[in-house]
Amino acid sequence: MIDDTENSKIHLEGSHKTGKYTGYGTTHKIRAQLNFNDEKKWKKFSSRRLELIDSFGLSQHKASEQDDNIRQIATILRSEFEYPDTFSAEFEKLVTAAVQSVRRNRKRSKKKLLDSKKKIARGKVQKIPLSPPSSSNMGSCSASNASSSDEEASVKEEPAEHALPSLNTITSQKLLPYPNGRTLPPVPTQVRSLLKKNASLLRDPSAPYAHGGDEKLQKFDIEDQPLESEQEYDFIAKSIIVEIVNNAIPLPEQIQRDKFIRPNLTKKKGCQSKVVISNNLRKLILSKIHNSRTCLEMSKDERNLDSFANLETLGKNSLMASISLVVENSFSHLPSSTKQYLTERLSSIEFLTILSQRLFMPATRQLFADLSQEKIQVRVLNLILGSLVKDYGFDASLAPINEIIYHMTLHQYPLVCSNKQSNPMRPHSTSEVLSAHSSTKDASTPGKEEPRVTRSSTSADSTIITLPSIEVPNTYDDDRLKMLSAISLQIENSTFSKPFSTISK
Protein backbone atom coordinates (compact mmCIF):
# COMPACT_ATOMS: atom_id res chain seq x y z
CA MET A 1 0.00 0.00 0.00
CA ILE A 2 2.81 2.37 0.82
CA ASP A 3 4.43 1.74 -2.54
CA ASP A 4 1.12 2.41 -4.31
CA THR A 5 0.73 5.68 -2.43
CA GLU A 6 4.22 6.77 -3.33
CA ASN A 7 3.73 5.83 -6.95
CA SER A 8 0.53 7.87 -7.09
CA LYS A 9 2.48 10.96 -6.08
CA ILE A 10 4.88 10.64 -8.98
CA HIS A 11 4.23 13.21 -11.72
CA LEU A 12 5.80 13.22 -15.12
CA GLU A 13 8.29 15.88 -16.16
CA GLY A 14 9.62 16.89 -19.55
CA SER A 15 12.18 14.81 -21.32
CA HIS A 16 15.85 15.66 -21.70
CA LYS A 17 18.28 13.72 -23.88
CA THR A 18 17.75 10.16 -22.67
CA GLY A 19 13.99 10.14 -22.29
CA LYS A 20 11.20 11.13 -19.92
CA TYR A 21 12.02 11.42 -16.24
CA THR A 22 9.73 11.58 -13.26
CA GLY A 23 10.91 14.28 -10.86
CA TYR A 24 9.97 12.67 -7.55
CA GLY A 25 10.55 9.06 -8.58
CA THR A 26 13.71 9.72 -10.57
CA THR A 27 15.33 11.66 -7.76
CA HIS A 28 14.69 8.91 -5.22
CA LYS A 29 15.82 6.16 -7.57
CA ILE A 30 19.07 7.93 -8.41
CA ARG A 31 19.61 8.78 -4.77
CA ALA A 32 19.31 5.09 -3.96
CA GLN A 33 21.71 4.18 -6.76
CA LEU A 34 24.25 6.69 -5.44
CA ASN A 35 23.76 5.43 -1.89
CA PHE A 36 23.00 9.02 -0.87
CA ASN A 37 21.39 8.18 2.49
CA ASP A 38 22.76 10.96 4.69
CA GLU A 39 19.91 13.50 4.97
CA LYS A 40 22.20 16.32 6.07
CA LYS A 41 24.52 15.72 3.15
CA TRP A 42 21.57 15.46 0.76
CA LYS A 43 20.20 18.83 1.90
CA LYS A 44 23.61 20.34 1.34
CA PHE A 45 23.68 18.79 -2.14
CA SER A 46 20.20 20.12 -2.97
CA SER A 47 21.02 23.65 -1.88
CA ARG A 48 24.28 23.61 -3.83
CA ARG A 49 22.46 22.30 -6.90
CA LEU A 50 19.90 25.13 -6.76
CA GLU A 51 22.67 27.66 -6.21
CA LEU A 52 24.50 26.54 -9.36
CA ILE A 53 21.28 26.47 -11.39
CA ASP A 54 20.52 30.03 -10.32
CA SER A 55 24.06 31.26 -10.93
CA PHE A 56 24.18 29.83 -14.45
CA GLY A 57 20.65 31.05 -15.23
CA LEU A 58 19.50 27.59 -16.29
CA SER A 59 15.94 28.26 -15.19
CA GLN A 60 15.50 30.81 -17.97
CA HIS A 61 15.56 28.15 -20.70
CA LYS A 62 14.33 24.61 -21.20
CA ALA A 63 16.54 21.81 -19.97
CA SER A 64 16.70 20.27 -23.43
CA GLU A 65 18.23 23.47 -24.81
CA GLN A 66 21.25 23.61 -22.50
CA ASP A 67 22.91 20.22 -22.42
CA ASP A 68 26.40 21.67 -22.01
CA ASN A 69 25.52 23.77 -18.96
CA ILE A 70 23.74 20.85 -17.33
CA ARG A 71 26.74 18.63 -17.97
CA GLN A 72 29.06 21.25 -16.46
CA ILE A 73 26.97 21.65 -13.31
CA ALA A 74 26.73 17.88 -12.96
CA THR A 75 30.53 17.69 -13.21
CA ILE A 76 30.88 20.32 -10.48
CA LEU A 77 28.50 18.50 -8.14
CA ARG A 78 30.04 15.11 -8.81
CA SER A 79 33.55 16.39 -8.10
CA GLU A 80 32.50 18.32 -5.00
CA PHE A 81 30.76 15.31 -3.49
CA GLU A 82 33.58 12.96 -4.57
CA TYR A 83 31.81 10.58 -6.93
CA PRO A 84 33.64 8.82 -9.80
CA ASP A 85 33.09 9.53 -13.49
CA THR A 86 30.88 6.47 -13.83
CA PHE A 87 28.04 8.37 -12.13
CA SER A 88 28.08 11.30 -14.57
CA ALA A 89 24.77 10.31 -16.18
CA GLU A 90 23.03 10.09 -12.79
CA PHE A 91 24.19 13.55 -11.77
CA GLU A 92 23.05 14.96 -15.12
CA LYS A 93 19.58 13.51 -14.50
CA LEU A 94 19.50 15.09 -11.03
CA VAL A 95 20.40 18.50 -12.45
CA THR A 96 17.84 18.12 -15.24
CA ALA A 97 15.07 17.26 -12.80
CA ALA A 98 15.98 20.25 -10.65
CA VAL A 99 15.92 22.63 -13.63
CA GLN A 100 12.49 21.40 -14.66
CA SER A 101 11.21 21.71 -11.10
CA VAL A 102 12.49 25.28 -10.74
CA ARG A 103 10.90 26.28 -14.05
CA ARG A 104 7.55 24.80 -13.01
CA ASN A 105 7.61 26.50 -9.62
CA ARG A 106 8.43 29.87 -11.14
CA LYS A 107 5.64 29.55 -13.70
CA ARG A 108 3.20 28.72 -10.91
CA SER A 109 4.33 31.62 -8.75
CA LYS A 110 4.09 34.05 -11.67
CA LYS A 111 0.62 32.76 -12.51
CA LYS A 112 -0.51 33.14 -8.89
CA LEU A 113 0.92 36.65 -8.75
CA LEU A 114 -0.83 37.60 -11.98
CA ASP A 115 -4.13 36.14 -10.77
CA SER A 116 -3.88 38.03 -7.48
CA LYS A 117 -3.18 41.29 -9.30
CA LYS A 118 -6.18 40.71 -11.56
CA LYS A 119 -8.40 40.04 -8.55
CA ILE A 120 -7.20 43.21 -6.83
CA ALA A 121 -7.74 45.24 -9.99
CA ARG A 122 -11.16 43.68 -10.52
CA GLY A 123 -12.10 44.50 -6.95
CA LYS A 124 -11.07 48.13 -7.42
CA VAL A 125 -13.21 48.42 -10.54
CA GLN A 126 -16.23 46.85 -8.84
CA LYS A 127 -16.04 49.40 -6.03
CA ILE A 128 -16.33 52.31 -8.49
CA PRO A 129 -19.96 53.55 -8.65
CA LEU A 130 -21.55 53.33 -12.06
CA SER A 131 -24.39 55.78 -11.39
CA PRO A 132 -25.21 58.71 -13.71
CA PRO A 133 -24.75 62.38 -12.65
CA SER A 134 -26.86 63.40 -9.69
CA SER A 135 -30.03 65.35 -10.19
CA SER A 136 -31.87 67.72 -7.86
CA ASN A 137 -35.12 65.84 -8.43
CA MET A 138 -33.89 62.32 -7.70
CA GLY A 139 -35.91 61.94 -4.55
CA SER A 140 -35.03 61.09 -0.99
CA CYS A 141 -31.91 59.34 0.29
CA SER A 142 -33.80 56.11 0.81
CA ALA A 143 -34.90 56.13 -2.79
CA SER A 144 -31.27 56.60 -3.87
CA ASN A 145 -30.26 53.58 -1.82
CA ALA A 146 -33.01 51.60 -3.45
CA SER A 147 -31.83 52.59 -6.92
CA SER A 148 -28.25 51.53 -6.18
CA SER A 149 -29.49 48.20 -4.84
CA ASP A 150 -31.64 47.81 -7.91
CA GLU A 151 -28.69 48.55 -10.16
CA GLU A 152 -26.55 45.84 -8.56
CA ALA A 153 -29.40 43.41 -8.98
CA SER A 154 -29.71 44.22 -12.67
CA VAL A 155 -26.00 43.63 -13.21
CA LYS A 156 -26.00 40.28 -11.42
CA GLU A 157 -29.17 38.99 -13.05
CA GLU A 158 -28.23 40.05 -16.58
CA PRO A 159 -28.03 36.87 -18.74
CA ALA A 160 -25.11 35.90 -20.98
CA GLU A 161 -26.75 37.31 -24.11
CA HIS A 162 -26.90 40.74 -22.36
CA ALA A 163 -30.70 40.89 -22.61
CA LEU A 164 -32.03 43.72 -20.44
CA PRO A 165 -34.43 42.36 -17.78
CA SER A 166 -37.75 44.09 -17.31
CA LEU A 167 -38.15 46.53 -14.44
CA ASN A 168 -41.12 44.57 -13.13
CA THR A 169 -38.95 41.47 -12.80
CA ILE A 170 -36.24 43.38 -10.96
CA THR A 171 -38.74 45.01 -8.64
CA SER A 172 -40.57 41.81 -7.82
CA GLN A 173 -37.48 39.65 -7.30
CA LYS A 174 -35.03 42.00 -5.63
CA LEU A 175 -37.01 44.67 -3.81
CA LEU A 176 -38.16 42.21 -1.17
CA PRO A 177 -38.12 42.71 2.59
CA TYR A 178 -34.75 42.44 4.34
CA PRO A 179 -34.23 39.56 6.76
CA ASN A 180 -34.94 41.84 9.74
CA GLY A 181 -38.42 42.59 8.45
CA ARG A 182 -37.83 46.15 7.14
CA THR A 183 -39.31 46.95 3.73
CA LEU A 184 -37.98 49.39 1.18
CA PRO A 185 -40.16 52.23 -0.10
CA PRO A 186 -41.51 51.98 -3.65
CA VAL A 187 -39.15 53.07 -6.40
CA PRO A 188 -40.21 56.36 -8.01
CA THR A 189 -40.83 56.47 -11.74
CA GLN A 190 -37.97 58.94 -12.28
CA VAL A 191 -35.51 56.63 -10.54
CA ARG A 192 -36.71 53.73 -12.69
CA SER A 193 -36.00 55.70 -15.86
CA LEU A 194 -32.48 56.47 -14.63
CA LEU A 195 -31.98 52.80 -13.79
CA LYS A 196 -33.00 51.84 -17.30
CA LYS A 197 -30.48 54.28 -18.79
CA ASN A 198 -27.79 52.97 -16.48
CA ALA A 199 -28.41 49.34 -17.44
CA SER A 200 -28.29 50.19 -21.14
CA LEU A 201 -24.95 51.93 -20.62
CA LEU A 202 -23.58 48.81 -18.98
CA ARG A 203 -24.20 46.99 -22.24
CA ASP A 204 -22.71 49.78 -24.41
CA PRO A 205 -20.52 52.18 -22.40
CA SER A 206 -19.94 54.35 -25.49
CA ALA A 207 -23.67 55.04 -25.99
CA PRO A 208 -24.79 58.54 -24.85
CA TYR A 209 -27.69 59.27 -22.54
CA ALA A 210 -31.13 59.76 -24.02
CA HIS A 211 -31.19 63.28 -22.54
CA GLY A 212 -27.95 65.15 -23.11
CA GLY A 213 -26.07 63.25 -25.83
CA ASP A 214 -22.62 64.67 -24.86
CA GLU A 215 -22.72 63.16 -21.38
CA LYS A 216 -21.22 59.68 -21.27
CA LEU A 217 -20.58 57.22 -18.53
CA GLN A 218 -16.93 57.36 -17.48
CA LYS A 219 -15.04 54.17 -18.30
CA PHE A 220 -12.47 52.71 -15.95
CA ASP A 221 -9.96 50.56 -17.76
CA ILE A 222 -7.72 48.09 -15.98
CA GLU A 223 -5.20 48.38 -18.81
CA ASP A 224 -3.93 51.67 -17.32
CA GLN A 225 -1.93 49.61 -14.84
CA PRO A 226 1.10 48.91 -17.11
CA LEU A 227 2.04 52.55 -16.54
CA GLU A 228 2.67 51.64 -12.91
CA SER A 229 4.75 48.67 -14.06
CA GLU A 230 6.93 50.95 -16.18
CA GLN A 231 7.48 53.15 -13.14
CA GLU A 232 8.36 50.07 -11.11
CA TYR A 233 10.91 48.99 -13.75
CA ASP A 234 12.40 52.48 -13.66
CA PHE A 235 12.59 52.47 -9.87
CA ILE A 236 14.26 49.04 -9.73
CA ALA A 237 16.83 49.97 -12.40
CA LYS A 238 17.60 53.22 -10.56
CA SER A 239 18.05 51.42 -7.24
CA ILE A 240 20.46 48.93 -8.84
CA ILE A 241 22.53 51.77 -10.31
CA VAL A 242 22.64 53.44 -6.88
CA GLU A 243 23.94 50.23 -5.29
CA ILE A 244 26.61 49.76 -7.95
CA VAL A 245 27.81 53.38 -7.94
CA ASN A 246 27.90 53.68 -4.15
CA ASN A 247 29.66 50.32 -3.78
CA ALA A 248 26.95 48.98 -1.47
CA ILE A 249 28.69 45.60 -1.51
CA PRO A 250 32.48 45.85 -0.98
CA LEU A 251 34.68 44.30 -3.65
CA PRO A 252 35.98 41.47 -1.39
CA GLU A 253 32.41 40.44 -0.68
CA GLN A 254 31.54 40.69 -4.37
CA ILE A 255 34.33 38.25 -5.17
CA GLN A 256 32.73 35.76 -2.78
CA ARG A 257 29.31 36.41 -4.31
CA ASP A 258 30.53 36.23 -7.88
CA LYS A 259 28.35 33.54 -9.42
CA PHE A 260 30.34 33.41 -12.64
CA ILE A 261 33.57 32.03 -11.14
CA ARG A 262 33.52 28.42 -12.36
CA PRO A 263 36.60 26.61 -11.04
CA ASN A 264 35.36 23.06 -11.62
CA LEU A 265 33.90 23.25 -15.12
CA THR A 266 36.89 21.52 -16.67
CA LYS A 267 40.15 19.94 -15.68
CA LYS A 268 42.21 22.13 -17.97
CA LYS A 269 44.89 24.13 -16.24
CA GLY A 270 44.05 27.34 -18.06
CA CYS A 271 40.60 27.58 -16.53
CA GLN A 272 41.76 29.20 -13.31
CA SER A 273 43.74 31.88 -15.13
CA LYS A 274 40.69 32.78 -17.21
CA VAL A 275 38.67 33.25 -14.02
CA VAL A 276 41.31 35.59 -12.60
CA ILE A 277 41.34 37.60 -15.83
CA SER A 278 37.57 38.01 -15.81
CA ASN A 279 37.56 38.99 -12.15
CA ASN A 280 40.30 41.58 -12.63
CA LEU A 281 38.54 43.07 -15.64
CA ARG A 282 35.30 43.31 -13.71
CA LYS A 283 37.06 45.07 -10.83
CA LEU A 284 38.61 47.49 -13.33
CA ILE A 285 35.19 48.36 -14.74
CA LEU A 286 33.69 48.75 -11.26
CA SER A 287 36.50 51.08 -10.20
CA LYS A 288 35.72 53.28 -13.21
CA ILE A 289 32.04 53.28 -12.25
CA HIS A 290 32.83 54.28 -8.65
CA ASN A 291 34.90 57.25 -9.91
CA SER A 292 32.53 58.31 -12.69
CA ARG A 293 30.92 61.69 -12.24
CA THR A 294 28.11 60.96 -14.69
CA CYS A 295 27.23 57.72 -12.89
CA LEU A 296 27.15 59.58 -9.58
CA GLU A 297 24.93 62.35 -10.95
CA MET A 298 22.58 59.80 -12.51
CA SER A 299 22.26 57.92 -9.20
CA LYS A 300 21.43 61.15 -7.33
CA ASP A 301 19.09 62.58 -9.95
CA GLU A 302 15.45 62.36 -8.91
CA ARG A 303 14.15 62.47 -12.46
CA ASN A 304 12.92 59.48 -14.41
CA LEU A 305 15.54 57.42 -16.25
CA ASP A 306 13.90 58.48 -19.50
CA SER A 307 15.73 61.78 -18.97
CA PHE A 308 18.95 59.89 -19.73
CA ALA A 309 17.68 58.42 -23.02
CA ASN A 310 20.58 59.86 -25.04
CA LEU A 311 23.07 58.48 -22.53
CA GLU A 312 21.43 55.07 -22.90
CA THR A 313 21.67 55.36 -26.70
CA LEU A 314 25.36 56.21 -26.38
CA GLY A 315 25.97 53.09 -24.31
CA LYS A 316 23.95 50.89 -26.67
CA ASN A 317 25.73 52.08 -29.81
CA SER A 318 29.13 51.82 -28.13
CA LEU A 319 28.37 48.25 -27.10
CA MET A 320 27.29 47.33 -30.63
CA ALA A 321 30.51 48.85 -32.00
CA SER A 322 32.52 46.91 -29.44
CA ILE A 323 30.87 43.63 -30.46
CA SER A 324 31.50 44.32 -34.15
CA LEU A 325 35.14 45.09 -33.42
CA VAL A 326 35.69 41.89 -31.41
CA VAL A 327 34.14 39.75 -34.15
CA GLU A 328 36.05 41.50 -36.92
CA ASN A 329 39.44 41.46 -35.21
CA SER A 330 39.36 38.23 -33.22
CA PHE A 331 37.46 35.99 -35.66
CA SER A 332 38.43 37.44 -39.03
CA HIS A 333 39.36 33.97 -40.32
CA LEU A 334 35.71 32.87 -40.23
CA PRO A 335 33.46 33.10 -43.30
CA SER A 336 31.43 36.25 -43.73
CA SER A 337 28.13 34.49 -43.03
CA THR A 338 29.53 33.02 -39.81
CA LYS A 339 30.78 36.40 -38.64
CA GLN A 340 27.40 37.93 -39.37
CA TYR A 341 25.65 35.18 -37.43
CA LEU A 342 28.11 35.58 -34.53
CA THR A 343 27.53 39.35 -34.45
CA GLU A 344 23.76 38.83 -34.36
CA ARG A 345 24.06 36.35 -31.50
CA LEU A 346 26.36 38.62 -29.49
CA SER A 347 23.98 41.54 -30.08
CA SER A 348 20.94 39.60 -28.87
CA ILE A 349 19.13 40.41 -25.64
CA GLU A 350 20.11 37.02 -24.22
CA PHE A 351 23.85 37.59 -24.62
CA LEU A 352 23.67 41.20 -23.37
CA THR A 353 21.72 39.96 -20.36
CA ILE A 354 24.46 37.46 -19.52
CA LEU A 355 27.07 40.21 -19.91
CA SER A 356 25.12 42.50 -17.58
CA GLN A 357 24.72 39.71 -15.03
CA ARG A 358 28.41 38.90 -15.21
CA LEU A 359 29.31 42.50 -14.45
CA PHE A 360 26.68 43.66 -11.98
CA MET A 361 24.95 40.70 -10.31
CA PRO A 362 27.54 40.40 -7.48
CA ALA A 363 27.35 44.19 -6.92
CA THR A 364 23.67 44.30 -5.95
CA ARG A 365 21.64 42.57 -3.27
CA GLN A 366 18.56 42.33 -5.48
CA LEU A 367 17.67 39.18 -7.40
CA PHE A 368 19.24 40.58 -10.53
CA ALA A 369 18.90 37.44 -12.66
CA ASP A 370 15.12 37.25 -12.03
CA LEU A 371 14.42 40.82 -13.19
CA SER A 372 13.28 41.86 -16.64
CA GLN A 373 16.05 41.37 -19.19
CA GLU A 374 15.42 44.22 -21.60
CA LYS A 375 13.78 46.75 -19.27
CA ILE A 376 16.19 46.39 -16.34
CA GLN A 377 19.30 44.28 -16.91
CA VAL A 378 20.27 45.46 -20.40
CA ARG A 379 19.10 49.00 -19.66
CA VAL A 380 21.38 49.24 -16.62
CA LEU A 381 24.27 48.03 -18.78
CA ASN A 382 23.61 50.64 -21.49
CA LEU A 383 23.21 53.51 -19.03
CA ILE A 384 26.39 52.71 -17.11
CA LEU A 385 28.43 52.07 -20.26
CA GLY A 386 27.21 55.33 -21.78
CA SER A 387 28.27 57.17 -18.61
CA LEU A 388 31.74 55.60 -18.75
CA VAL A 389 32.19 56.50 -22.43
CA LYS A 390 31.16 60.07 -21.68
CA ASP A 391 33.63 60.38 -18.78
CA TYR A 392 36.60 58.32 -19.98
CA GLY A 393 36.24 58.08 -23.76
CA PHE A 394 35.74 55.07 -25.97
CA ASP A 395 39.07 53.26 -25.73
CA ALA A 396 39.54 53.37 -21.96
CA SER A 397 35.92 52.36 -21.33
CA LEU A 398 35.50 49.63 -23.95
CA ALA A 399 38.88 47.88 -23.78
CA PRO A 400 37.94 45.74 -20.72
CA ILE A 401 34.45 45.19 -22.17
CA ASN A 402 36.04 43.91 -25.39
CA GLU A 403 38.18 41.45 -23.44
CA ILE A 404 35.17 40.13 -21.51
CA ILE A 405 33.11 39.78 -24.69
CA TYR A 406 35.96 37.87 -26.31
CA HIS A 407 36.22 35.32 -23.48
CA MET A 408 32.44 34.97 -23.23
CA THR A 409 32.31 34.27 -26.97
CA LEU A 410 34.88 31.50 -26.64
CA HIS A 411 32.96 30.03 -23.72
CA GLN A 412 29.51 30.11 -25.33
CA TYR A 413 30.65 29.22 -28.85
CA PRO A 414 33.46 26.68 -28.40
CA LEU A 415 33.32 25.64 -32.06
CA VAL A 416 34.62 29.08 -32.95
CA CYS A 417 37.55 28.50 -30.63
CA SER A 418 38.30 25.03 -32.00
CA ASN A 419 38.26 26.29 -35.60
CA LYS A 420 40.59 29.19 -34.92
CA GLN A 421 43.76 29.59 -36.86
CA SER A 422 47.15 29.40 -35.21
CA ASN A 423 47.57 33.18 -34.91
CA PRO A 424 44.10 34.77 -34.70
CA MET A 425 43.37 38.36 -33.85
CA ARG A 426 42.32 38.82 -30.25
CA PRO A 427 42.12 41.51 -27.60
CA HIS A 428 45.01 42.40 -25.36
CA SER A 429 45.54 40.17 -22.36
CA THR A 430 44.31 41.34 -18.98
CA SER A 431 47.76 42.43 -17.87
CA GLU A 432 48.09 44.57 -21.01
CA VAL A 433 44.69 46.14 -20.43
CA LEU A 434 45.48 46.86 -16.78
CA SER A 435 48.88 48.35 -17.60
CA ALA A 436 47.32 50.45 -20.32
CA HIS A 437 44.69 51.58 -17.85
CA SER A 438 47.34 52.70 -15.37
CA SER A 439 49.11 54.65 -18.10
CA THR A 440 45.88 56.37 -19.18
CA LYS A 441 44.71 57.50 -15.75
CA ASP A 442 45.95 60.99 -16.60
CA ALA A 443 43.16 61.20 -19.17
CA SER A 444 40.63 61.79 -16.38
CA THR A 445 42.62 64.60 -14.73
CA PRO A 446 41.27 68.21 -14.66
CA GLY A 447 41.29 70.08 -17.95
CA LYS A 448 41.21 67.01 -20.12
CA GLU A 449 39.95 67.44 -23.64
CA GLU A 450 36.68 66.08 -24.88
CA PRO A 451 36.96 62.33 -25.60
CA ARG A 452 37.51 61.51 -29.25
CA VAL A 453 35.94 58.65 -31.11
CA THR A 454 39.21 57.30 -32.47
CA ARG A 455 42.81 57.03 -31.38
CA SER A 456 45.95 56.09 -33.21
CA SER A 457 46.83 52.45 -32.86
CA THR A 458 50.49 53.36 -32.50
CA SER A 459 50.11 55.60 -29.45
CA ALA A 460 51.61 54.43 -26.20
CA ASP A 461 48.45 54.78 -24.15
CA SER A 462 46.16 53.00 -26.59
CA THR A 463 44.06 50.17 -25.25
CA ILE A 464 42.54 49.11 -28.56
CA ILE A 465 42.37 45.52 -29.71
CA THR A 466 45.12 44.92 -32.26
CA LEU A 467 47.60 42.36 -33.44
CA PRO A 468 51.23 43.15 -32.67
CA SER A 469 52.15 42.69 -36.33
CA ILE A 470 49.09 44.21 -37.99
CA GLU A 471 48.28 47.91 -37.91
CA VAL A 472 44.66 48.81 -37.30
CA PRO A 473 44.00 52.30 -38.69
CA ASN A 474 40.87 53.02 -36.67
CA THR A 475 39.43 51.75 -33.41
CA TYR A 476 35.89 51.66 -34.82
CA ASP A 477 35.69 50.87 -38.52
CA ASP A 478 31.92 50.56 -38.49
CA ASP A 479 31.05 54.01 -39.89
CA ARG A 480 27.41 53.93 -38.89
CA LEU A 481 28.00 52.99 -35.27
CA LYS A 482 30.95 55.37 -35.10
CA MET A 483 28.81 58.25 -36.30
CA LEU A 484 25.90 57.44 -33.96
CA SER A 485 28.18 57.08 -30.96
CA ALA A 486 30.00 60.32 -31.76
CA ILE A 487 26.72 62.22 -32.15
CA SER A 488 25.37 60.82 -28.88
CA LEU A 489 28.57 61.74 -27.06
CA GLN A 490 28.55 65.26 -28.54
CA ILE A 491 24.93 65.82 -27.49
CA GLU A 492 25.56 64.44 -24.01
CA ASN A 493 28.62 66.66 -23.46
CA SER A 494 26.80 69.74 -24.74
CA THR A 495 24.34 69.51 -21.84
CA PHE A 496 27.03 70.92 -19.56
CA SER A 497 28.29 74.47 -20.03
CA LYS A 498 31.78 73.55 -18.86
CA PRO A 499 33.60 70.24 -18.93
CA PHE A 500 33.93 68.69 -15.53
CA SER A 501 37.31 69.07 -13.90
CA THR A 502 37.46 65.90 -11.89
CA ILE A 503 35.86 62.49 -12.01
CA SER A 504 35.22 61.90 -8.36
CA LYS A 505 32.51 61.80 -5.87
Swiss-Prot record:
Reported function: Transcription factor that regulates ERG9, but seems to have a more global function in transcription.
Ranges of Basic and acidic residues composition bias in the record: 1-16
Bridged cysteine pairs (disulfide): none
Presence of the UniProt keyword Hydrolase in the record: no
Primary localization: nucleus
GO molecular function terms noted in the UniProt entry: DNA binding
Protein name in UniProt: Transcription factor VHR2
Annotated organism of origin: Saccharomyces cerevisiae (strain ATCC 204508 / S288c) (Baker's yeast)
Extra remark: Present with 1730 molecules/cell in log phase SD medium.
Chain positions covered by the region annotation Disordered: 1-23, 105-179, 421-460
GO cellular component, one term: cytoplasm
Keyword Transcription regulation attached: yes
